[in-house]
Amino acid sequence: MDKLKIEASEALAGNVVISGAKNAALPILMAGVLAETDFVVTNVPNLRDVNTSCELLRCLGAEVTRSDNSEVRISTSSLDHFCAPYDLVKTMRASILILGPLLARFGTADVSLPGGCAIGARPVNLHLHGLEQMGAKIEVEEGYIKARVDGRLKGAHIFMDMVSVGATENLLMAATLADGETIIENAAREPEVIDLANCLIAMGAKIEGAGTDSIRIQGVESLNGCHYRVMPDRIETGSFLIAAAVTRGKIRCVDADPSTLEAVLAKLEDAGATITTGSDWIELDMQGKRPKAVNIKTVPYPGFPTDMQAQFCLLNVLAEGTSTITETIFENRFMHVPELIRMGANMELEGNTCIIQGIERLNGAQVMATDLRASASLVIAGLVAEGTTIVDRIYHLDRGYEHIEDKFKGLGGQVVRVS
């Protein structure tokens, strides 16, 4: 099993090209099931979860081809299977997003209950309840969600009990081919939801309000394929900015979108970083400065993202002062804390809050990645730790970061993949 070996590195410097957003690419690939003609998606990152999504589409009978330049072409003319099996779904929670498109276009879907990062319950009941309101008949048996609808789904006024990105995306896709109008209230406002909606609109869908908490969809008879470019990955961008901040370096993230990172950039400025932005780049300068501690509370977009919590934990570990980080989105999302403590961090947990006293330096250690974003924080920790750090179980990392060791090397980081 691969590991990353990391040595203490100098201040990061240079440019890093940001990949397409995993959390936008996955639902957009699933939306290919809705298209009656060929569908081409570009700026698709080369990640484990993306490969799993492509394999899932092939398992359903779709023709999926991937070129070397981050382009995926999908044809559903031969799609004739409607079951997403356990062996594929167990490795990736986003597989649940195939449910809405299959049901909307073909009237039937059997989807294994999903897997993915072990960071809390994250139940699928919001997905199922919304589809039931649209006329679907759903049973959960033998580990599978079995959904059927006679004819087409029907438009509905859906009130989400809580904000859920995945449920918003699933219901949004399903509603595009439903009879009549669907309104999703308390919808997720994340940029990835907007990106999916823009893709669906390019396919012929009628959608208003994406990016607000009320999305209105007028169902259409059919959707066609299109050419669509996936948005930049805001979490990858934020992760590299954190790495530059803790190494007291200066980097520029190119092919980035600063408008999707306002809460993160504001906190980095509070920590003492100088931030400069253009339409498609972000520059961070922390040369010669130690970060200042910043308090964080994760909330749904446009607030501070839960996917940046682990990285800011690390920043605060090395910052001047005491800080608190409160996690309100997911349970069990402080599994990186014991690993950082192994490296010398001064941290303690009280319920869903982590209290951190900043220290000058970490020590290299053998640590274990527990989920996608936690693994990123451990890799960055290795860049500033004295000695050698080994990060095990980096298959988590490969689910969400494209060529991370090569990108760090390009900035001066000493990171190598070993078996």
UniProtKB/Swiss-Prot annotation:
It catalyses: phosphoenolpyruvate + UDP-N-acetyl-alpha-D-glucosamine = UDP-N-acetyl-3-O-(1-carboxyvinyl)-alpha-D-glucosamine + phosphate. It is found in: Cytoplasm. Pfam families: EPSP_synthase (PF00275). The active site is at C117 (proton donor). The modification 2-(S-cysteinyl)pyruvic acid O-phosphothioketal is found at C117. GO terms for molecular function: UDP-N-acetylglucosamine 1-carboxyvinyltransferase activity. UDP-N-acetyl-alpha-D-glucosamine binds at R93, D307, I329. Keywords: Cell cycle, Cell division, Cell shape, Cell wall biogenesis/degradation, Cytoplasm, Peptidoglycan synthesis, Pyruvate, Transferase. Its EC number is 2.5.1.7. Phosphoenolpyruvate binds at K22, N23. GO terms for biological process: cell division; cell wall organization; peptidoglycan biosynthetic process; regulation of cell shape; UDP-N-acetylgalactosamine biosynthetic process. One of its GO terms (cellular component) is cytoplasm. CDD domains: UdpNAET. Pathway: Cell wall biogenesis; peptidoglycan biosynthesis. Belongs to the EPSP synthase family. MurA subfamily. PANTHER family: UDP-N-ACETYLGLUCOSAMINE 1-CARBOXYVINYLTRANSFERASE (PTHR43783:SF1). Cell wall formation. Adds enolpyruvyl to UDP-N-acetylglucosamine. This is UDP-N-acetylglucosamine 1-carboxyvinyltransferase.
